[in-house]
Amino acid sequence: MSPKKDTQKSAKSTTAINKESNGFTDEERAAMKERAQELKADARRGPRGKKDKADGEGDVLAKIAAMQEPDRAMAKRLHAIIKASAPALSPKTWYGMPAYAKDGKVVCFFQSAQKFNTRYATLGFSETANLDEGALWPVAFALKELTATEEARIVALVKKAVS
C-alpha cells in the first residue's frame, strides 16, 4: 500500500471514530441544534421588548404542547406557578425546553424526562438565580409529580431566585 492511501485510510478511520464518540448523545446534539435555532429566531426578532415576551410565551406553550404525558402536565403546571410567583420573568425556550428569564438571562428552566431519556423531569436554576445558602446549595430538582407540597416549595424557590 502506498503511503498516501495509508494516510487516507487513517484519516477516514479517525473521522469514523470521532463521529461515534464525540462525547455528546443524540439528545444532547438535538438540544444544541434547537439552541442554535432559538438564537437565530431571537436575532430575527430584534431588540427585547413586550413583543418578544409574547413570542417567548407562544414558543414555550408550543414546546409544552408537544411534550408527552406526564411531562406535559408538569410543564403546564410549572409554567402557571412560575408566571404567578414571578411575573417579571419572561418565558422563552432554552435548548428546546421551557425557561424563564430576567433581563434576558435564564433564571430557571424545565427539562422533560423524555428529552434525555431520564426517569424524572428536572426543574433547574442558573447561576443568576439568588439561591445561595452558604457554600453549598442545590440548583436542580428531580420531579416525578407535582403535589401541593412540591408546588409550595417551587413557589418559594422561584420567589427566592428572583429576589
Question: Predicted segment positions?
Answer:
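Charge-dense, helix-prone N-terminal extensions
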Residues: M1-S163
